[in-house]
């Protein structure tokens, strides 16, 4: 539905209903039964990237600010999860690095928020961010699945998916082909683009990283 939700008619409907901000999330193959057939191919992802930026054109756009969770990584310094800027707490109280990454080693019923933020998985996130210097490839799961698999294994984090508990190997195996196909296209786009001189990069200082 990537063309439907970026169409002129859909955007105009949002504006008419008073919407002034929209954040697009790409499909993530989370869960044992998740289909990889629903993942965008490189051509489709490039279309979404360009279309979302066209919609949010401040001079000629329709009056709604749109952002793309995957394609606008450069404006927030890549992945913001794992406590860098945000994390997710599921219905069971498990402190997860991201709403899409159901692994954890801490729970708010047993740990303070500070303890949750200092859990090994979150610290591994901070040690490895940014997960890719090309911020069109920001995610440790979708575009860099080898990293997520490694840090979950190294930290001993457990699956916290309440519907379909899934090993990190199974999850990441669904992302390798996508990552391999997107990488050359993303690198070409990144190398041909001009980037902000003073980007938002609140990373852990290199001298403090444990990697």
Regions from the PLM with identified roles:
Residues 1-78, 82, 91-96, 100-111:
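Radical SAM enzyme [4Fe-4S]-AdoMet core and its adjacent flexible, acidic
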Residues 84, 92, 134-136:
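Active-site lining segments that contact anionic ligands and/or coordinate catalytic metals
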Residues 100-211:
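Flexible mid-to-C-terminal extensions adjoining Fe-S/redox cofactors in radical SAM and related proteins
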């Amino acid at each position: 539905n990537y063309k439907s939700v970026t169409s002129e008619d859909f955007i105009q409907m949002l504006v008419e209903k008073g919407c002034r901000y929209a954040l697009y999330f790409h499909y993530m193959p989370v869960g044992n039964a998740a289909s990889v057939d629903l993942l965008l191919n490189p051509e489709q992802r490039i279309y979404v990237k360009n279309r979302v930026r066209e919609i949010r054109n401040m001079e000629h756009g329709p009056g709604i600010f749109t952002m793309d969770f995957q394609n606008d990584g450069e404006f927030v310094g890549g992945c913001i999860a794992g406590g860098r800027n945000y994390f997710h707490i599921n219905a069971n109280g498990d402190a997860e690095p991201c709403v899409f990454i159901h692994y954890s080693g801490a729970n708010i019923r047993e740990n303070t928020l500070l303890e949750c933020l200092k859990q090994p998985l979150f610290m591994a996130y901070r040690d490895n961010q940014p997960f890719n210097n090309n911020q069109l490839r920001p995610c440790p799961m979708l575009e860099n699945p080898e990293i997520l698999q490694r840090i979950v294994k190294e930290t001993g984090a457990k699956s916290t998916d309440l519907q379909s508990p899934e090993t990190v190997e199974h999850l990441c195996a669904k992302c390798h082909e996508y990552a391999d196909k997107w990488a050359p296209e993303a690198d070409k786009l990144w190398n041909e683009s001009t980037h902000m001189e003073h980007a938002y990069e609140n990373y852990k200082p290199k001298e403090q990283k444990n990697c």
